[in-house]
Regions:
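Juxtamembrane intracellular "pre-TM" segments in multi-pass secondary transporters
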Residues: 1-5, 187-218, 402
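Residue-level signature of mid-helix packing/kink "hotspots" within the transmembrane helices
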Residues: 56-64, 114, 147-148, 261-269, ...
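Conserved MFS/SLC helix-loop-helix module at the cytosolic interface between two early adjacent transmembrane helices
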Residues: 60-97, 275-281
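Paired small-residue
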Residues: 89, 100-108, 294, 305-313
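Symmetry-related core transmembrane helices of the 12-TM Major Facilitator Superfamily/SLC fold
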Residues: 166-183, 373-389
Length: 402
């Protein structure tokens, strides 16, 4: 097996374990807060949002830093540093005695949440541009698979062993992934990086992005996709309750989440392959339109089964969006600054993770949950229009130049 293929297999496994582990603790965070003292329901709900959101906010701020450091020092050392940081943050969560300590550790976890983005940059840098979509789509399958099994496994462990031991087990699994990278990954130097030249400053990188519309449009698209996806997630359990009632609510809410993940898992690699063949922007426009269309029946759903079917179909479209966006950036970004550029893209991704629940909550509180589905459908449609306009503008520019 070649070094590149071996690295890919190991990073895929590490992504699976890290993604599964970080999502294992999500289902019971609010329940864990309740055990720390006697709080009102409003306090628990408010601080559950703070504790959940602070990780994404900090990750949004520091992602370019990890990308830039990876370009300078190598991706492997960043994988080990961020993985160890996540493992320690989660380990200490098992010892907290107040919600403020938990908040601080979730903040610290956000500062070191660079494992999966860095692994993406590493594999992208070692992959030929002609097969980037297929490779990155396959890599995302590891992340999606982990996020599918993580919440289910975390809930089972919490019921069986309690919250504290679940934190310990989660930390151990992530640290095992770090050891897997340490002993298994062999980073290959890139020709662009080994050439002697003056390193790019952050100002030069930002200037490069600004003068490449294809790059910043993709970053805006990343934010829009994540905003749309996360705008519904906090409301899904409430919507399932409206459609199905309170019987086995947690189980059926989990099914609604898993339906999307399963759809993504099935076609993520295929969409990436099609993007390599026919152009990532062309595939992205189709997927954004499909995602928009599949959201409208969810707003009109009269039963849980209808919701599950269209959550699954939406997942099939969603599975190709981020891999194709990343592959399109891979084609445009020079290898010497690719990590930092992907870091900025990840920042936009985390910004969408923060904005999505905020927008969904505001819309649903002022109108209805169904209204949030309509707004999300519009966001995906707007993304398709933005990409189509950019494509048309580029074609017109080339025609005038010739």
């Amino acid at each position: 097996m070649s070094i590149r293929k071996k690295n890919f297999v190991i990073v895929w496994l590490a992504n699976f374990f890290v993604s599964a582990s970080t999502t294992m603790i999500v289902p019971f965070l609010s329940l864990y807060i309740e055990t720390l003292s006697t709080f009102s329901n409003g306090f628990v709900q408010r601080w559950s949002g703070y504790v959940f959101g602070i990780t994404f906010l900090m990750a949004f701020l520091v992602s370019p830093f990890w990308g830039r450091l990876g370009d300078k020092r190598g991706y492997k050392i960043i994988l080990m540093a961020t993985g160890t940081g996540i493992a320690l943050s989660i380990l200490f969560m098992g010892f907290v005695t107040s919600v403020y300590q938990l908040f601080f550790l979730r903040m610290a976890m956000g500062l070191v949440t660079g494992f999966i983005p860095t692994s993406l940059a590493m594999i992208s840098a070692q992959t030929p541009k002609g097969s980037a979509g297929k490779t990155l789509g396959t890599l995302q399958m590891g992340q999606v698979s982990g996020s599918l099994f993580g919440p289910l496994l975390g809930g089972m462990l919490a019921d069986r062993f309690g919250f504290t031991y679940t934190f310990f087990i989660t930390s151990f699994v992530i640290f095992s992934s770090v050891l897997l990278v340490l002993f298994g990954v062999k980073e290959q130097p890139l020709a662009e990086k080994t050439a002697k030249r003056t390193p790019y400053t952050r100002k030069e990188v930002l200037s490069f992005i600004f003068h490449q519309p294809a790059l910043w449009v993709m970053m805006l698209l990343t934010m829009l996709v994540q905003t749309g996806n996360f705008s519904i997630q906090p409301l899904l359990a409430l919507y399932v309750n409206e459609l199905h009632g309170p019987v086995n609510l947690a189980f059926f809410s989990g099914m609604a989440f898993s339906a999307t993940g399963l759809g993504s898992l099935l076609l993520a690699r295929k969409w990436g392959d099609l993007g390599d063949r026919y152009g990532h922007r062309r595939i992205l426009i189709g997927l954004l339109l499909a995602a928009s269309i599949f959201f409208i029946p969810q707003a009109l759903a009269s039963s849980l089964s209808v919701l599950l079917v269209f959550r699954f179909l939406f997942g099939m479209a969603m599975g190709g969006l981020l891999p194709c966006i990343t592959a399109a950036i891979r084609v445009q970004a020079p290898g010497s600054i690719q990590g930092e550029i992907l870091g900025y893209n990840v920042s936009f991704r985390f910004l969408g993770n923060v904005l999505g629940p905020l927008i969904g909550g505001i819309i649903s509180s002022h109108f209805t949950i169904s209204a949030a589905f309509y707004v999300t459908a519009f966001l995906f449609f707007a993304g398709a229009c933005m990409l189509w306009i950019m494509q048309k503008f580029r074609k017109d520019s080339y025609a005038k130049a010739s």
